[in-house]
Amino acid sequence: MSVAPPAPSPPPFDPTKPSTPISFPIKTLQDLKSRSYFDSFHYPFNRSSVPLRRNIGALSDRPRLLVCHDMKGGYVDDKWVQGCGNNAGYAIWDWYLMDVFVYFSHSLVTLPPPCWTNTAHRHGVKVLGTFITEWDEGKATCKELLATKESAQMYAERLAELAAALGFDGWLINIENVIDEVQIPNLMVFVSHLTKVMHSSVPGGLVIWYDSVTIDGHLAWQDQLTENNKPFFDICDGIFMNYTWKENYPKASAEIAGDRKYDVYMGIDVFGRGTYGGGQWTANVALDLLKSSNVSAAIFAPGWVYETEQPPDFYTAQNKWWSLVEKSWGIVQTYPQVLPFYSDFNQGLGSHTSLGGRKLSEAPWYNISCQSLQPFLEFNEGRNSETIQVTVDGREASYNGGGNVSFRGKLKRNAHFTARLFKPQLQLSAAPISIFFSVKSDKRSELSILLHFSSPSQEKKSMLMVPNESINRFGDMFLPCLLTSKQTTSGWTVHETNLVLDGHTLTEISAFCSRPDDLTEETNTLEYFALLGHISIKSQQKAKVYPLASSWVIEAHHVKFVPGDSGSKTLSCKLEWRLKHPEEDSVFPKYNVYAENLSSSEYRPRKVMEEPRSEKVFLGTAHVDAYYVSEMVVGSDVKGVRFVVQTCGEDGSWQELDASPNLVVEVERVSSKLCCCGLI
């Protein structure tokens, strides 16, 4: 009986070789010192593309909320920069409750995957990477790191350079090992120099010290601000306290910190390991105490909900857990604050992908970079059949992306129901604004948008955007706002209205559920179902104009064909594009990438798309000006592949495919050996 030999081990990861873009940490001081990360094929893909939502310098002068990721060791589904197919991956969407997000792993230098920085920045949340040393290996690392004052400064500068280049906001420093007391002065140099360089290289840069090693070099978690850890606190932007503190520690720490009490972040371990209040479903007990003690909080490992598979399902359990945080801590972010404003309620994962109501793909996907501004939905426990349940739903139809807000339940004939969507602080001028939103509903359900305003004299106004036939019913309750509506072929209705409210501030956006006037059923209470696909607010004076296809240079690099079965091949290549003459307003948040197979009769290179010849297949979304096509199967009859790059605007608009830049890669004849070609 013969035994098949074991399959060969995959070759070790070589970051300099072309492959599907991933995020990864830096594991050694040598790699940090050599700056080898910048030579990686993956580096350009790992740059975040979304600046902090507003120019936030110093953090707000109030108790703040820091959230430390720590989910299954880090770099799971989120390591795939262009996304992956696991739509059951871990995500966070309650960004309006937090000020700072830390991406954590146990590698020496944890670089946040760009998806977290992109979506956190979109919501106004700062993002930190982690520098950690632990136990005996960490002691040896620190001995090298802190050998001289110059080495301490050099490594600090390397960390600051990485944050600036990749677009995140700073570092959590966690030295969890003993330090030779003689090296403590150089540790102080490392922390103070890193703080100084971060402040000068990244606007609003932030360095936070973890309560671990003490000023005498002992590994002794203090759990509060003391003379043993305060010297580190004094030379950086804050301290993340270990999570085994006692009831009186927060107030005592606030007294010692004085004017910097909000820079003290008391740790809460959501797993409940020795943490005050027990963590888990009673994490709010600790939050309540910290709020009353007038210090900040640091939530560690909220992925507990996901890792322990809390019932009934991740989505429900996640919303329930974060609702406890909201009740204790309150909302700390407001958006929108500037125009344009756009949200399609995308949570960064879904079971399909749509554009303008048309499905581009039925494939499940996960890409947190695609998460749009998240609604401030209120969590209501229990499925009360007599009320309307409001949820973000990735299974039902989407107008754009893979999400929507779903309204399901029962509603009486003459009743209405409102649900909070956003808490803006949007100052309006004399310039008219346009508001768009898309709805898909059954004939018995009507969905509108309710806007709340505050005048310069603090007078409150509410304006309901309703179709013309419904104005009489609600005119005595709200100021009516006429809509124009356009039906799409996919069953979505896109509503539009224009407003001028000079000097007013938009303070809330809500959904408004009601029944149509021409309801024929005699039953008083009926099932209600409607989907809200997107909402967009933009200035009429700034209509998006997309560059012509001829304005772009698009290239293919690292083109590789590998023979497959029955004459087929796989194609891998890196697509890159740039404007020939970039302008100030030529920065785009994302690009949709498509591929179109060309037979011999269809193949001819051209600069501009003409009549569509064959189906263009959606490949994915890029958030930088490059996309890696990995092992795409090309049939034996295909002579060329046309790649199309569709530019998308921050107002939710997109360039028509026929006007988008494109490039044809000619399919080579390949033998049984690997065949590669270079620049197309």
Swiss-Prot record:
Enzyme class: hydrolase
Swiss-Prot/TrEMBL GO biological process terms: N-glycan processing; protein deglycosylation
Coiled-coil regions listed in the entry: none
Lineage top rank: taxon: Eukaryota
Gene Ontology CC annotation, any one: cytoplasm
Residue span of region Disordered: 1-21
Disruption-associated phenotype: No visible phenotype under normal growth conditions, but the double mutants engase85A and engase85B accumulate very high level of free N-glycans carrying two GlcNAc at the reducing end, but their counterparts with a single GlcNAc are completely absent.
Cited InterPro entries: ENGase, Glyco_hydro_85
Molecular function terms from GO: mannosyl-glycoprotein endo-beta-N-acetylglucosaminidase activity
Pfam families linked to this entry: Glyco_hydro_85 (PF03644)
Reaction(s) catalysed (UniProt annotation): an N(4)-(oligosaccharide-(1->3)-[oligosaccharide-(1->6)]-beta-D-Man-(1->4)-beta-D-GlcNAc-(1->4)-alpha-D-GlcNAc)-L-asparaginyl-[protein] + H2O = an oligosaccharide-(1->3)-[oligosaccharide-(1->6)]-beta-D-Man-(1->4)-D-GlcNAc + N(4)-(N-acetyl-beta-D-glucosaminyl)-L-asparaginyl-[protein]
pH dependence, entry free text: Optimum pH is 6.0-7.0.
Composition bias, Pro residues: 1-15
Keyword Hydrolase: yes
This enzyme's EC code(s): 3.2.1.96
Keywords: Cytoplasm, Glycosidase, Hydrolase
Localization per Swiss-Prot or TrEMBL: Cytoplasm, Cytosol
Function: Endoglycosidase that releases N-glycans from glycoproteins by cleaving the beta-1,4-glycosidic bond in the N,N'-diacetylchitobiose core. Involved in the production of high-mannose type N-glycans during plant development and fruit maturation.
Family affiliation: Belongs to the glycosyl hydrolase 85 family.
The protein, known as: Cytosolic endo-beta-N-acetylglucosaminidase 1
Organism name: Arabidopsis thaliana (Mouse-ear cress)
Gene it is expressed from: ENGASE1
